[in-house]
């Protein structure tokens, strides 16, 4: 270590020792992360060693064997499964308070409602007990504990645990912010979803699931509506003894920054844009060379997680995330669960249909899933067969639509978009009910004017800049 790093660590360590809000596991995990960061163990990728993974490493979904119609085989597979949803995020970017998973998605049902309905249907149909586990952060824990009470009568065992709570570090002094009197939530941060492995282990839940005969955990973001239990993938992993599987899907131009899987020195590895040397960034973004990206749907063997966490072997790439909060420059160090792939034996990717990646990150995504482009059956959001184009319409809504409440108030009803290619809306625009959008549509209200799209209007390949264009 450099001299400064050698001085920084003991000073930070003694400050962390005095933070009573942290458990011993959190303290050692945090110091471990910081010392790796200070030692500069950032992983440098040698571009010339990168190889495109073969079909053995990234298995095409349609080449996987189907699961038989025999209900006993399905039950056998499901009895080995735990479903874990990453539930640490807040709905703040969409103007909502509380966990993002309680935003209403469709028909009055929230992300969490849909997840519970899906698992309950599996449990009822196959007479099994697939548990649902929610990994909360300190930001979402209290609210989530209250929310899950509504599911006590459902046929799903719901477990919750908290991911680690680490102190933000004041950048110029390199001390934990809470040690300097920052006692509210802003002094802390959850260290990314790479923390799922040690936190699941430290919660005691991992050992409990192993003792019940569970073998695999399916991890996914709670806002990905496409991340449903897939027996074909589970069967493949059990048969082939794959300790880790990452679902990837073909890139579109919207996904050029997403992490991709590569073969590197004989191992399968996640390559993120932050690891790419500047001179190769355009190549990384090319859909020709790097054709797939990580959906963050992950299937991981529970025994393998236990073994690797106990050996302290999961040294994922550190993502430094500098921020300015209340005028103070702070640093938070994070890791990603997908980067763990290279530590597991017999790890694979599976190239899945795009339908398994349907994230709701903004109100433009809500417009898609609330429209006639999708229907809701048994908690599953399925695509309307009437849409012939395999890709979804590109939707851009202006800042007036950013918050869920504003978005909902500006549409009397969600327009029909089955035949829409792209929609761009900006300014003070209001939609009536029964509106149909087709082809490429742009609606722009000039500054200071309110533009109302009348009930039952059909807009096909139109640029609307005022009432005269309707």
From Swiss-Prot:
Residues found modified as N-acetylalanine = 2
> Which keywords does the record carry?
Acetylation, Cytoplasm, Nucleotidyltransferase, Transferase
- Tissue expression summary: Expressed in roots, rosette leaves, cauline leaves, stems, flowers and siliques.
Q: A GO molecular function for this record?
A: UTP:glucose-1-phosphate uridylyltransferase activity
Q: Which CDD domains match?
A: UGPase_euk
Location in the cell reads:
Cytoplasm
Q: Which domain of life is it from?
A: Eukaryota
Q: Which residues form the signal peptide?
A: none
Q: Offer a single GO CC term for the protein.
A: plasma membrane
The record ties this protein, via Pfam families, to: UDPGP (PF01704)
- Locate the residues binding UTP: 86-89, 100, 163, 192, 223, 361
Q: Which residues form a coiled coil?
A: none
Q: Which reaction does it catalyse?
A: alpha-D-glucose 1-phosphate + UTP + H(+) = UDP-alpha-D-glucose + diphosphate
Disulfide bond found in the keyword field: no
What family does this belong to?
Belongs to the UDPGP type 1 family.
What name goes with this protein?
Answer: UTP--glucose-1-phosphate uridylyltransferase 1
